Amino acid sequence: RYAPVTWSDAPDNRRIAIAWMSNWQYANDVPTSQYRSPNSVPRDLSLFTVDGETYLQSAPSPELLKLRDVSKKRSFKVNGTRIIKDMIAGNEGAYEIELTIENQHADVIGFRLYNDKGEEVDMQYDMKEKKFSMDRRKSGDVGFNENFPMLTWTAIESGKDELKLRLLVDKSS
């Protein structure tokens, strides 16, 4: 994210920001003709402290909940692979996923978002290394710039055997 814009005087002293959703490494090479790099969803910013270190937290603003249409909720156990395509059917390419993964004995837990075109994004959490990774090397047209198709990762402190994620998937970014 680049060039965040924040607002002052938001209700309840909130700090709300949007940002340009692109990367200077490939911003001029995206495979579009008129539409280039949207803004992010509005998100609330806050600070938190762990072991004396202060961190910035970013979460989608609660007003986004008003945009939800239909909600589906499921609990299930996975040993190996499970396909949940029916849960996101009919979403026209935009949906939100909130999930809590409770790990029983795996060193790595992961999932894949994919579509009927063969495009896919893999996400994994390495429980031992405490690293979350996202692999977008097969996410569609990735050949427009050598810096786009990549595996990225970040350190994440999660609960002992639990990982909570909130994913906003759209069809235009």
Predicted regions and their residues:
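Beta-rich accessory regions
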Residues: 5-173
